[in-house]
């Protein structure tokens, strides 16, 4: 498995998601990475309106990067495959447990 986590370059970047009812919610990009195994790029997001004391629900999507590898101008895709989701969860767990990556 080969993934490259892009934590630093995604700082201070936000994405607005729109739900089925048309409600908009602003999200911060936690990090992005690319999986050679799945041939896809992924973005992990958390709500922008969360305080430091709140539990945070991280959302993950695959995306089609533009020519610069940017996620903010591309469509997000739900992850529906269990094996793919387990891979993304493993990358997130590694990120959260590694102080050098998470910035803690």
Curated annotation (Swiss-Prot):
Superkingdom of origin: Bacteria
InterPro entries noted in UniProt: EF_Hand_1_Ca_BS, UPF0473
Coiled coil location: none
Disulphide bridges: none
Transmembrane segments: none
Family: Belongs to the UPF0473 family.
Name of protein: UPF0473 protein LJ_0477
Biological source species: Lactobacillus johnsonii (strain CNCM I-12250 / La1 / NCC 533)
């Amino acid at each position: 498995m080969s993934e490259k986590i892009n934590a630093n370059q995604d700082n201070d970047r936000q994405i607005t998601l729109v739900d089925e009812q048309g409600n908009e919610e602003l999200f911060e990009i936690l990090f992005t990475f690319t999986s050679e195994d799945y041939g896809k790029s992924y973005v992990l997001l958390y709500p922008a309106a969360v305080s430091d004391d709140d539990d945070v629900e991280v959302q993950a999507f695959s995306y089609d990067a533009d020519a610069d590898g940017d996620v903010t101008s591309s469509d997000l895709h739900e992850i529906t495959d269990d094996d793919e989701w387990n891979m993304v969860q493993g990358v997130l767990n590694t990120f959260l447990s590694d102080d050098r990556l998470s910035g803690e």
